[in-house]
Amino acid sequence: MSQGNLYILSAPSGAGKSSLISALLASDSSTQKMVSVSHTTRAPRPGEVEGVHYYFVSKEEFESLIEQDLFLEYAKVFGGNYYGTSLPAIEENLAKGIDVFLDIDWQGAQQIRKKVPSVKSIFILPPSLPELERRLIGRGQDSEEVIAERMSKAMSEISHYDEYDYVIVNDDFEKTLKDLQSILQSERLTKDYQQKQNAMLIQQLLAK
């Protein structure tokens, strides 16, 4: 059975990451793909489904999982809630040949690289700061103050782009989607990947 690849996908708010992930999962059925579902201690919001949006657990359960070293990465955010990525769930899906995407920020990415050096990371850039602000305003969800905060945070996040393996400018949605698909395909053609997937064939070809 093929081994799946683990990917980190990061971007500032408004860069189009969520839409790109949804489109990527719906495309190219030749490879299985999924977004990792995180654990959190915060209460479910209206419309959120257990196991689809998050795994909702108590603070005590979460801290027990931390003690057992069962998180690939985790963080305690403003307000006191925990968020984390389950290591056993990731390993199980990768073993099934599923490419797993982690929708996390640069801080989570740094944690994961220490535990899984083979992870591939992708950063999505906006075409410009004015365009990023226009997209945030166009959502119609946030006040001017919140948008200003998001823009400030975006500039901080963008400063970490050079820590990533791949960088894509999302100035054309369809082109960016194709770029993402190309990354997935190319990662399955690397020497390291093929040595694992076709070990027996390579051994036979090299046998005297």
From Swiss-Prot:
Name the CDD domains for this protein. GMPK
Q: Does the keyword 4Fe-4S apply?
A: no
Query: Can you say where in the cell this protein is located?
Result: Cytoplasm
Q: What class of enzyme is it?
A: transferase
Where is each Guanylate kinase-like domain found?
Answer: 4-185
Record key words, sorted: ATP-binding, Cytoplasm, Kinase, Nucleotide-binding, Transferase
Q: Which SUPFAM superfamilies match?
A: P-loop containing nucleoside triphosphate hydrolases
Q: Keyword Cytoplasm on this protein?
A: yes
**Per the record, what are the reactions this protein catalyses?**
GMP + ATP = GDP + ADP
Q: Which family does it belong to?
A: Belongs to the guanylate kinase family.
Protein purpose? Essential for recycling GMP and indirectly, cGMP.
Provide the protein name: Guanylate kinase
